[in-house]
A protein has these predicted regions:
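Ubiquitin-like/PB1-type beta-grasp interaction modules and other compact soluble beta-rich domains
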Residues: 1-78
Length: 79
């Protein structure tokens, strides 16, 4: 599973993306546990981050498959 980081999340993780070795689908809670185990600094951002899977926003009950591309989307504003 490839996980992408954007904006200040890149700073928190010191990388643009990471490959997670997973053998079976993960729920969002399991995914967060795996990410926080590797990048504890993400804990400060969790409440404001949306998950996206294969370029579409994910709902909280979604399962993420081993071959998915997951993105952590920080708050976005525009004008």
């Amino acid at each position: 599973m490839r996980v992408l980081f954007f904006a200040h999340l890149k700073d928190a993780t010191n990388c643009n993306s990471v490959e997670l070795a997973v053998a079976q689908p993960l729920g969002s809670e399991q995914l967060w546990e795996a990410l926080l185990g590797r990048f504890p600094a993400l804990a400060d951002h969790r409440a404001s981050v949306r998950l996206a899977c294969n370029q579409e926003y994910a709902d909280p009950q979604m399962l993420f498959n081993p071959d998915d591309e997951v993105a952590l989307i920080p708050p976005v504003s525009g004008g």
